[in-house]
A protein has these predicted regions:
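Non-ligating segments of multi-cofactor redox enzymes
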Residues: 1-225
Length: 225
């Protein structure tokens, strides 16, 4: 009986893995691209293993998932494969009218995903938070500045305006530009993240005040299961 109860604790982790496997197989078959099977199987495997380790009381379980998934998306997908997985990449593929790369990523992790697992993206997979969580202010030392939350909407609007402008002006070599925007955008995110962390004595100050992705995350998180 005790062993059955122990196994039941890991059911959510197994369900999470199976959910990503379902996405992996569906995209692999519908888009006839093996990459989707490997990509989502890897991410789902890391998330399933990490949450299982967390359930088992392993101290660094969440950090393991952050590094495994965040580094993969930043270095392999972003730098090596030259896919802009930032919000600008989402607008880019959306305006092209294709459902791949950043549009799939945003649909799964940031638009519909939060209905199932809330802000799991922020805690387990975000490559910006992955680095910021190494800073010394794990417990916020100052009250939250609610009014500064409007800055995330400014950032959201600026990213939309930037990519819209590039399309409207019919700028050449957009794919290459999006890659450089990915590199520059991440550098700016990290710089802003460090500055805000030290100003507000809070590792996640950037996430609370500047991150434009929260505009997508908040609606689904309110109704999260």
């Amino acid at each position: 009986m005790k062993s059955n109860n122990e196994l039941c604790r890991y059911v959510p982790s197994m369900m999470l893995f199976l959910l990503f496997e379902a996405v992996a197989v569906t995209l692999w078959l519908t888009k006839d691209n093996l990459f989707y099977l490997l990509n989502f199987s890897y991410i789902g495997g890391c998330l399933g293993m990490g949450t299982a380790l967390f359930t088992a009381g392993k101290r660094y379980a969440r950090r393991f998932v952050q590094l495994a998934v965040g580094s993969y998306m930043l270095i392999y997908l972003g730098v090596i494969s030259r896919e802009n997985m930032q919000i600008e990449g989402f607008w880019y593929y959306l305006f092209l009218g294709v459902f791949e790369a950043a549009t799939i990523h945003y649909a799964v992790a940031k638009i519909f995903g939060p209905l199932l697992f809330g802000r799991g993206w922020c805690g387990y997979a975000c490559w910006t938070a992955m680095v910021l969580d190494f800073l010394p202010y794990k417990q916020p030392q100052k009250p939250r500045k609610e009014k500064l939350g409007i800055l995330r909407y400014v950032m959201f609007a600026l990213s939309l305006a930037l990519v819209s402008g590039l399309f409207l002006m019919k700028v050449a070599h957009l794919e290459q530009i999006m890659f450089w925007l990915f590199l520059a955008g991440n550098a700016l995110y990290y710089i802003a993240g460090f500055v805000f962390a030290y100003l507000f004595k809070d590792n996640r100050a950037f996430c609370k005040y500047l991150c434009p992705v929260t505009v997508f995350l908040k609606p689904g998180s309110y109704f999260s299961l």
